[in-house]
Amino acid sequence: MSRYTGPSWKQARRLGLSLTGTGKELARRNYVPGQHGPNNRSKLSEYGLQLAEKQKLRFSYGLGEKQFRNLFVQATKIKQGTLGFNFMLLLERRLDNVVYRLGLATTRRQARQFVNHGHILVDGKRVDIPSYRVEVGQVISVREKSIKVPAILEAVEATLGRPAFVSFDAEKLEGSLTRLPERDEINPEINEALVVEFYNKML
């Protein structure tokens, strides 16, 4: 399954979840596209609920199915902690996500573009791989040639707050993951147990 590249508002309404973090997609119509009103959502089967929850999480991070599933498999090899939360931590440690959490981009999709275009440094070295796994304490910064990119400056200015597990210096345009997040600090609307149940049946 390829990565979804269509309108984020349509996908957000289908999933009942804001994919940009702003909630704007659901502000006017928080029901499925094509549905005649908010009360006509059909009841899902157990499999349907698991699939829907998996899709919510996958689309939130903007990943294709193969990449998402492979990351889940990696999470199964971590011996400490719970599988669902370990999976979410791996998603959170992706470079594109950390760039987004730092407020260097307004969406994860934009953060991925910044990484792909070589605007982002990790410990002073350019990294253009969005899936790069960030370690606690590594410094994420903007390349000197990119510090005046309007979209980056606009994102920093528009960011009103950042998670407690990151630090950021707006003057230097750099920050870091200071610790791993707690479960209640990330995606509280997701029931990761349903995602685990879905993949346990598939793998």
Swiss-Prot record:
Protein name per the record: Small ribosomal subunit protein uS4
Xref: Gene3D superfamilies: Ribosomal Protein S4 Delta 41, Chain A, domain 1, RNA-binding S4 domain
Database matches in Pfam families: Ribosomal_S4, S4
Gene Ontology CC: small ribosomal subunit
Record gene name: rpsD
Segments forming domain S4 RNA-binding: 93-156
Domain of life: Bacteria
Family annotation (HAMAP family): Ribosomal_uS4_B (MF_01306_B)
Family note: Belongs to the universal ribosomal protein uS4 family.
GO biological process, one term: translation
Record lineage: Bacteria, Bacillati, Bacillota, Bacilli, Lactobacillales
Keyword terms, alphabetized: Ribonucleoprotein, Ribosomal protein, RNA-binding, rRNA-binding
Gene Ontology MF term list: rRNA binding; structural constituent of ribosome
